[in-house]
Structures are given as structure tokens and as C-alpha cells.
Curated annotation (Swiss-Prot):
Residues 11-74 form the S5 DRBM domain. Belongs to the universal ribosomal protein uS5 family. Part of the 30S ribosomal subunit. Contacts proteins S4 and S8. Pfam families: Ribosomal_S5, Ribosomal_S5_C. One of its GO terms (cellular component) is small ribosomal subunit. With S4 and S12 plays an important role in translational accuracy. Located at the back of the 30S subunit body where it stabilizes the conformation of the head with respect to the body. GO terms for molecular function: rRNA binding; structural constituent of ribosome. GO terms for biological process: translation. This is Small ribosomal subunit protein uS5. Keywords: Ribonucleoprotein, Ribosomal protein, RNA-binding, rRNA-binding.
Amino acid sequence: MHYEKKLSIELKEKLISVNRVSKTVKGGRIFSFTALTVVGNNQGKVGFGYGKAREVPSAIQKAMEKARKNMIIIPLFKNTIQHSVTGLHTGSFIFMKPASEGTGIIAGGAMRSVLEVAGIQNILAKIYGSTNPINVVRATLNGLKKIRSPEMISKKRGKIITII
């Protein structure tokens, strides 16, 4: 229990979007809210959550809890990614490319938030197709999941790192 509290303190949380949605029933409409959040530790660990509730704070709380449970680890190299990568989810297609020191995060919309909480400081990124925040976040995480460090590749191939 103590470990979870310590873990949650070092995590950086970011709210991407809050949306009001409605369900039409016989007596009229029932309104509820959805929240999309990302959580990361600024050292290559990132996750996203999507929560829905009748009130905004409850939706955000649910989204944050889901984000903490769905975290992935990204192998970073000098505050950027190891190699160029693409990600796809439904209509959103993203392209990310490592950048030199001092470039900053050149990315738009929801992708910028994901990269910031992941701890990536220098990157060039572009969204093609749909810019729907949910699809962009999922496409970004799909792309980040594809990143492999030289150590991972050498281990998989059974070769030494210098050959790769």
C-alpha cells in the first residue's frame, strides 16, 4: 500500500479532453461526461485512461485510475526515441522521428501531452488523418510500443550490439 502512494506521487498526470455525451431515453436525455487522461513518470513509462461518469470529477478520477493500470515502458535514448516509428489506430496515422538535443517536442494536439508525460524532450512528430484525441493517443501509444532498443534487438537476434 505504501509503495502505491509513493508511485502515484512521482507520476505526472495530464487531462487531454473532457466531453459531454448524452443518452436518449423515453423521458428525455441523460447527460454524462467522458474524460481522456495520460499518466507518465517522465522516464519512459506512460499510460492512458478513458473514464465516463455523471459528473466531471468522477470521470477524471476513473480515467486516471485506468491510466495508471495501463502503463507501458518505452526505451528512451538521450531524451528522445531510439528510431523513427509509425503508429496507427482507426483513422489516425502518426509518424515520430528522433530529434537532436534542443529541438523540443514538435507535435500537435493530444500527441504532445503523451510525449511530455513519457519524458521525451526532443522529437519530431506528425498526425495524418483523424485528429480525434482518443484515436491520436491510441495511435501514439501503438507507435511507442514498437520502439526497440539496440539491446532488445541484439538479444532477439542472438548477436552482439556492435554488429547491430
